[in-house]
Amino acid sequence: MIEISCASIQSVGKGNAKLIEFQYKREKENILISLKTDSTQIGTFHRIATIIYALKMDIISGELSTVIEQGNEYTIDSFILQADGGDTTKVAFQLGMMMDSVFSKNAKFEEILEKLQIQEPAVATFFKETPEFIFSDLPEKNRTCLYLESSAGRGLLYYVSRILMQNQINILSATIETDMETGRAKDSFYLTDGSGQMFASTDLALKIRREILAPIQSNSR
């Protein structure tokens, strides 16, 4: 069942239960959205970033978190989005409806991707000006922090989150920031590997860095 008002979408399934709470409002020329879902598996943020990118929006700031309420685990995210022209209210509503489809228990993400016909972002432009990738383990929290600083642009988080997902990296929380004066993205991701362990000092961190930077490395040959 889906309940829709001018500012929120809520979907609660039966049997194979699913929960999606989506709210949005205009914030000057931007859109502020919040999302709560019981989908917490690896790749959850990539699904969100994919839909945002497909609708020609860019995440300029945001917070990602994983919480436990009454013994159940939830993903709670909030973002400020910059829309690429058009009717921002209409785009935000469309975003909410697509989120419901993406997180449906019966949805196949690959089929949704085919329908969206997403074009790859110009990845090389993100990393041409001294990108920073700093992996550091936080033993007291049993997680790895990835600090990423690069040129900002639509599709950056879609691209980075896809590589993290492909390497079975779980995003437990994150802070997304854009310095509007310098045009630099300054993002911090708190991660574990597929086994729930830290990995900053392992070959996996080097592999992720290498894969993220692959487009500019191939262009330099």
Protein language model features and the residues they cover:
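Regulatory modules associated with amino-acid/nitrogen control
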Residues: M1-R221
